[in-house]
Amino acid sequence: MNESSSTSARMNRRESRFMRALRREPVDQTPIWLMRQAGRYLPEYRATRAKAGDFLTLAGTPELACEVTLQPIQRYGFDASILFSDILILPHVMGLELSFTPGEGPKFARTIRHPDDVRNLPTPDPMNETRAVMQAVELIRQELPAETPLIGFAGSPWTVATYMIEGGSSKDFAKARRFLLQQPEAAEHLIQHLARCTTDYLLAQVASGADALMLFDSWGGVLSPSLFHRFSLNGMKSIVQTIQQQHPDVPIILFAKGCAFHLEALADTGCQALGIDWTTTLSDARRRVGDRVALQGNLDPVVLTSSAAVIEQAVQDTLDDYGEGPGHVFNLGHGITPDVPPEHVDVLVETVRNYRSGKLTPST
């Protein structure tokens, strides 16, 4: 594709349902994509994963990452695609040595325990140390339908920090929370360092072809309000503001799971949209943030493990709850789970499409 064609395609994507919804502009029907839409619920994903041999090889091989990114687009025709990668790539290239243990999830060979561990963290060059990610973005952009926007993403500084301190996942992230309390200066340094590195990483994704960006704050909800503002919100706000200064036309979605108490503060970061989990109604979120941001969400993922009738009603209820007017991107309240039958996603997509095309009427 020559430069003129590439520019034209970018402009067309800016007018897509997904991008218009993020700008709170009118659309013909509610756009839909799903968090973790490329994943283990799809047989084609499992086949590619088996071919790769392990998760890091899958995520770190541009051709394979492109293949699994495209699979849900080819099957369901979602209104947006999201890069297949992992939020822990950055600490991995900082030397913490990431691995994935079956049944246990991510593990780091090295962890953050002392202030010196933070001071010794390198600043990776995203076009060098994470070059495979950028090559995947470039390849996906080439292979995606020209009109389909591509979402780049990263983990929030706090969420990434939890894994770096704990050495893996945790039920309550007590070690990470204790680090904030006992080593607040080192913790702030860690969050600031991760914010700078994440900003560079996301800017590189934009330069490589991403049309929109998303920050996942999976574990902000484990923090007290004061700790959330100091160690989670501030890091995300720094990332949003720096990227917006350089790319005001690139929308940023913040998804902070379990953080309904902080919706107003999250909307004030300067982001264009907030992801909402299923513990908050869209109508309440909309009332609280007004017209400052679009909303994305928020179907409980377990609905997709039920029946077609339950899915149809739950989707209709979600759309009814948002109500009339622009600014809604349909999604789940968290990632799709491996036990979801692929045909249930067909029901989900069809119900969203039909609701907005007039084949379904709002429930009363």
Model regions: which residues?
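Iron-associated oxidoreductase/ferritin-like identity signal
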Residues: 2-3, 10-11, 119, 135, ...
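N-terminal basic, low-complexity leaders that serve as flexible interaction/assembly modules and, when applicable
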Residues: 2-102, 139, 312, 320, ...
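Short, flexible, mixed-charge acidic loops at enzyme active sites
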Residues: 45-47, 96-111, 163-174, 289-290
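Short glycine/proline- and acidic residue-enriched helix-loop micro-motifs
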Residues: 52-54, 115-125, 180-187
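Short gly/ser-rich anion-binding loops that grip negatively charged ligand groups
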Residues: 55, 59, 63, 119-130, ...
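Short, flexible active-site-proximal loops enriched in glycine and acidic residues
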Residues: 80, 109, 149-151
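A gly/proline- and charged-residue-enriched helix-loop-helix capping module
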Residues: 103-143
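Active-site loop segments of alpha/beta catalytic cores
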Residues: 129-364
